[in-house]
Design a protein with these regions (language model features):
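A beta-strand-loop signature enriched in Asp, Gly, Thr, and Trp
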Residues: 95-105, 129-133, 144
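Generic structural signal for well-ordered, non-membrane alpha-helical segments
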Residues: 23, 27-34, 52-55, 59, ...
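Short, charged low-complexity intrinsically disordered segments located at boundaries
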Residues: 12-20, 66-70, 93-97, 112-119, ...
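A generic structural micro-environment signature
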Residues: 9, 47, 53-56, 98, ...
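Contiguous, well-ordered alpha-helical segments that form the cores/surfaces of helical PPI scaffolds
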Residues: 32, 36, 57-67, 83-91, ...
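Functionally critical mobile loop/hinge segments
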Residues: 120-219
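Accessory "access/gating" subregions that flank catalytic or transport cores
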Residues: 1-104, 211-219
Length: 219
């Protein structure tokens, strides 16, 4: 059972696209970069766990987006991005879970909670906006099952990296568009994620005994 690689062909096509004439070109590049990491992991290549191998495409895709499309991107912004994303990941690891086998695939996308880099949109994000971005990212992943087809980290995992990376950028932009005030706190969504995962049947928690894993014909 194998999935055809798509990242290289997508990147080659995008190299011939005038990004100024296509406002969604940046999203296509995010998809390509996330695909590349997901595909490398699926074929047994070397990737950096963040927070799992199956979700390792999100951070590099968003970082590459920052370096490529954000005016004034800097090494300082990258460091702050990684430090803050790591800190939020530790909050989830300490107070909930980052394990798909424990609480489903929602746990793997905790780093949708990310710091808008320092020069993103030309101003500093307030800590409340950082927390808001983290909350938005997880709130809309609640209940996400982990049901890999054939037990391989390919379907839906590779595409899910791309979807999550785009969602991470959007969560940051939504948070930056506000003043940081919001009804749902990060603590509340973290607790909800953990409780939701514990309520999931085991067939939806990385066992490949339910969901897509049993409804896709492997031939």
């Amino acid at each position: 059972f194998a999935v055809r690689r798509r990242a290289k062909h997508l990147a080659q096509r995008l190299e011939n696209v005038n990004s100024a004439s296509d406002p969604l070109c940046a999203l296509d590049w995010i998809n390509a970069w996330a695909f590349a990491v997901g595909e490398e992991n699926a074929c047994g290549g070397r990737v950096v766990t963040s927070p799992t191998n199956g979700a390792a495409g999100v951070i590099p895709a968003v970082l590459r987006y920052y370096r490529t499309f954000i005016q004034g991107a800097s090494p300082e912004g990258i460091r702050e991005f990684l430090l803050t994303a790591g800190a939020i990941g530790l909050l989830y690891k300490s107070n909930a879970s980052i394990s798909g086998a424990e609480v489903g695939c929602q746990a793997k996308w905790v780093l949708l909670a990310r710091w808008p880099p320092v020069r993103w949109l030309q101003f500093w994000a307030h800590p409340r906006q950082v927390e808001n971005a983290a909350e938005i990212g997880m709130e809309h992943c609640l209940g996400l099952t982990c049901d890999p087809v054939a037990g391989q980290v390919q379907i839906p995992c590779i595409e899910r990296n791309a979807v999550a990376a785009v969602k991470a950028v959007n969560a940051a932009r939504l948070a930056l568009a506000g003043d940081g005030s919001h009804f749902v706190s990060l603590d509340a969504v973290m607790q909800t994620m953990f409780e939701t995962g514990k309520d999931m049947q085991s067939k939806y928690r990385e066992t490949s005994r339910g969901g897509l894993a049993v409804n896709i014909v492997e031939c």
